[in-house]
């Protein structure tokens, strides 16, 4: 190069770059000028640099080897032709080599463009001969705002690669050239990659480029820190000293111990003034709580109002149209704060949860939320609305004609209890003297005396009205007196009592001598008949079920008034007299009692005992009680679950009653049965708290079942004689219940049963209450025996 060109501005820059095509600003390189700049005029550059404020800057010393490498790298295609404009000349240095920009100043320096005004594109001809602008790749330097060009980066944008599945390319670069799809390795390459895993290998594919996704060194370091439970951020200290912006110590004493000012307890005067102003304005009408809309607001043309039903013509309902039934209104159990009695217990909740959804009585359980803001969303809301919709359009509808019947007219016309008086209402006399429970009692046919027996083994006779004890006898030291009954009839006064395995017949010395002598004559008449009976043969004597022989009592019992003893060998719990007073029946309900001797009929005039049943009564367990019919030769025998009627004259089974009770405790026959007043009626008490009324002509099932007691019913009794249509029952809940039960002779009408009164006075002792009850023969009075050791007269 000539020395005259030493005054030209030259700039040489050397730096280490990656093996990429560099992009430099400035004039295009000329081959001749480049050779001269690198070889001949090296000293000129340094001299010019020192002498003047030239823009040529030499950063590094260049060797001849670098010049030769740079010349070799230059390609012929990168050298512009002579026809191109010198202002647009541009060449790219080889990657990794020297990048130099030399501004050649011609003689006319003003005509050369500045470095900022130089163009970053070149013009080429496309296939149609039109001009086409080609932009060079940007290769930023250290001072540039651009980042390094990533040759693996995809410039197609945020477009899914699935759009290019059917094409060999995956997008286009900035110049519109296709970016070809990267080649995929075969099975052998995949095997080699799995054996020699490069650093940063993930086994994933980058969705934007289609190439294997590799992690950088920074990302690997971040993953290592996370795996080792280290802090990912550099320079972060998790153990910095605590700065207590607020104290962690609980302060007990106040910050200020000054007394509270009075203004905090006195209403504010300023607020009172403001409130009074508002009140005055409301009274004067200057402030209205509701301001009605004016006519201008109502006639506002900008507001368009639509009437959806303006063109809808009124249509009559179909003749067969049936409106949908309304849902029942919600009850107390659906409240968010229901009363406590509507909330289920734990047992009820568990039973409801364990039951099948179809077997549940309701779809939800009542809950108490306390306040409305705590009520959550109803989980079955959508289900209920869906089922309601199904019912509306799937369930058939039927018109049901309502019967205009007064419900009161359907109920039986029962008289008022006030109209059915007299009946016992209060306790008049209390009989005290027994030690332990009083198990049984009976009122004599005259209505003057009361006999009772209890656990102390004694039988006591009381004066009914005064409660004074007149006579007492000790029948047993160990066994209680289970039952006492007076012989019917007023011609004699004979008392039968069952204690232990024996039956005792006594004449209490409480009457006049004539009555006492008549009673003793009736008892003594049987001894002569018993002596005239021939003794049993040896074969009959060896039988186990031979009837017992009547015996005379011991001297001590005879002095007390006992006249005869019947050894039954089993405990009798029931004793009932025939209406004529010559027969009485006993029942031994023990499980160890043989069936053939459980029921015995005794003849008073002959001192004879007979066993009418050879076998156990079928069905229902052992017998519990037995009574004679008041007017017919019929014996009623009750076992645990049924009652059988036997005709003694014909020795036939007449009828079987099925009360439906689990265990019958007692029963009684109406005193006017089989007379002009009506048919056979009887009442049954059971240990399962039921009181049953049976009409034998109506059915073998009970006519009425009354459940008014909370515990077992021990005894039931009709008023004797039929003068008063009353009957009573005694229960272990400590109460007696008085009923009105009238029977008419009209076969088309049924018996009328009306509850009258509940009598309470006995104390419950040992889970036992009232054990026996009996009526006065002429008055509407009743007497009860309790487990508390007392007897009570109710009138």
From Swiss-Prot:
Recite the UniProt keywords alphabetically. Answer: Nucleus, Repeat, Ribosome biogenesis, rRNA processing, WD repeat
Q: Which domain of life is it from?
A: Eukaryota
Q: Does Hydrolase show up as a keyword for this record?
A: no
According to its UniProt record, where is this protein located? Answer: Nucleus, Nucleolus; Nucleus, Nucleoplasm
- Gene Ontology cellular component terms for the protein in this record: nucleoplasm; PeBoW complex; preribosome, large subunit precursor
Span list, region Disordered: 1-133, 319-365
Bias regions of kind Basic residues — which residues? Answer: 1-12
What residue spans carry the Basic and acidic residues bias annotation? 122-133, 344-365
Please name the GO terms that the record assigns under molecular function.
Answer: large ribosomal subunit rRNA binding; ribonucleoprotein complex binding
Which purpose does this protein serve, as stated in its record? Component of the NOP7 complex, which is required for maturation of the 25S and 5.8S ribosomal RNAs and formation of the 60S ribosome.
Name of the protein this chain belongs to = Ribosome biogenesis protein erb1
Q: Which organism encodes this protein?
A: Aspergillus fumigatus (strain ATCC MYA-4609 / CBS 101355 / FGSC A1100 / Af293)
Q: Gene that codes for this?
A: erb1
């Amino acid at each position: 190069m000539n020395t005259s060109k030493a005054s030209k501005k030259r700039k040489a820059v050397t730096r280490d770059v990656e093996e990429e095509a560099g992009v430099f600003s400035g004039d295009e390189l000329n081959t001749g000028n480049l050779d001269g700049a690198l070889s001949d005029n090296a000293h000129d550059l340094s001299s010019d640099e020192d002498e003047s404020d030239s823009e040529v800057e030499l950063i590094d010393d260049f060797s001849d080897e670098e010049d030769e490498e740079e010349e070799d790298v230059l390609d012929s295609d990168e050298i512009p032709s002579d026809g191109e404009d010198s202002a647009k000349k541009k060449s790219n240095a080889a990657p990794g080599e020297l990048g130099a920009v030399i501004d050649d100043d011609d003689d006319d320096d003003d005509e050369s463009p500045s470095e900022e005004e130089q163009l970053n594109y070149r013009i080429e001809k496309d296939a149609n001969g039109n001009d086409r602008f080609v932009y060079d790749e940007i290769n930023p330097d250290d001072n540039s705002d651009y980042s390094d060009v990533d040759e693996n980066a995809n410039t197609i944008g945020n477009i899914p690669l699935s759009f290019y599945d059917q094409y060999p390319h995956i997008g286009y670069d900035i110049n519109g050239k296709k970016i070809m799809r990267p080649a995929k390795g075969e099975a052998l390459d995949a095997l080699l990659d799995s054996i020699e895993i490069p650093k940063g290998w993930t086994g994933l594919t980058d969705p934007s480029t289609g190439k294997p996704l590799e992690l950088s060194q920074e990302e690997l370091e971040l993953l290592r820190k996370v795996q080792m439970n280290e802090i990912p951020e550099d320079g972060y200290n998790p153990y910095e000293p605590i700065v207590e912006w607020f104290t962690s110590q609980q302060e007990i004493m106040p910050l200020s111990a000054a007394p509270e000012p009075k203004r905090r307890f006195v209403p504010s005067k300023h607020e009172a003034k403001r409130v009074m102003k508002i009140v005055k304005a409301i009274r004067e009408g200057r402030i209205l709580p509701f301001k009605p809309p004016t006519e201008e607001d109502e006639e506002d043309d900008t507001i368009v109002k639509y009437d959806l039903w303006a063109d809808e013509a009124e249509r009559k309902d179909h003749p067969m149209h049936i409106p949908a039934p309304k849902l029942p209104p919600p009850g107390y159990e659906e409240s968010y704060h229901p009363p406590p009695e509507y909330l289920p217990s734990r047992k009820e909740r568990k039973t409801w949860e364990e039951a099948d959804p179809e077997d549940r009585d309701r779809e939800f359980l009542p809950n108490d939320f306390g306040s409305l803001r705590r009520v959550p969303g109803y989980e079955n809301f959508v289900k209920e609305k869906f089922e309601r919709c199904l019912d509306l359009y799937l369930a058939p509808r039927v018109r049901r004609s309502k019967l205009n019947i007064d419900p009161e007219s359907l109920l039986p016309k029962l008289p008022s209890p006030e109209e059915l008086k007299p009946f016992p209402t209060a306790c008049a006399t209390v009989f005290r003297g027994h030690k332990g429970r009083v198990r049984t009692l009976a009122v004599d046919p005259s209505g003057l005396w009361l006999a009772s027996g209890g656990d102390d083994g004694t039988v006591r006779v009381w004066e009914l009205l005064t409660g004074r004890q007149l006579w007492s006898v000790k029948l047993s030291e160990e066994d209680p007196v289970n039952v006492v009954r007076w012989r019917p009839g007023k011609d004699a006064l004979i008392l039968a009592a069952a204690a232990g395995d024996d039956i005792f017949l006594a004449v209490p010395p409480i009457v006049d001598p004539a009555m006492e002598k008549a009673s003793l004559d009736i008892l003594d008449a049987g001894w002569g008949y018993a002596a005239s009976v021939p003794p049993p043969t040896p074969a009959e004597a060896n039988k186990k079920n031979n009837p017992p022989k009547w015996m005379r009592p011991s001297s001590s019992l005879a002095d007390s008034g006992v006249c005869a003893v019947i050894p039954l060998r089993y405990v009798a719990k029931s004793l009932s007299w025939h209406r004529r007073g010559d027969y009485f029946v006993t029942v031994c309900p023990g499980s160890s009692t043989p069936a053939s001797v459980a029921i015995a009929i005794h003849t008073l005039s002959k001192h004879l005992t007979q066993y009418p049943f050879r076998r156990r009564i079928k069905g229902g367990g052992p017998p519990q009680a037995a009574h004679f019919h008041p007017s017919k030769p019929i014996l009623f025998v009750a076992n645990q679950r049924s009652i059988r009627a036997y005709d003694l004259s014909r020795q036939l089974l007449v009828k079987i009653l099925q009360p439906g009770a689990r265990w019958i405790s007692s029963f009684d026959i109406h005193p006017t049965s089989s007379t002009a007043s009506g048919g056979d009626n009887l009442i049954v008490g059971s240990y399962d708290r039921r009181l049953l009324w049976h009409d034998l002509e109506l059915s073998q099932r009970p006519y009425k079942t009354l459940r008014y007691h909370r515990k077992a019913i021990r005894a039931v009794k009709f008023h004797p004689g039929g003068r008063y249509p009353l009957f009573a029952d005694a229960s272990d809940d400590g109460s007696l219940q008085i009923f009105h039960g009238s029977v008419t002779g009209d076969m088309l009408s049924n018996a009328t049963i009306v509850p009258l009164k509940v009598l309470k006075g006995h104390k419950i002792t040992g889970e036992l209450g009232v054990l026996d009850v009996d009526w006065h023969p002429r008055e509407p009075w009743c007497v009860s025996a309790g487990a508390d050791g007392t007897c009570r007269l109710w009138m």
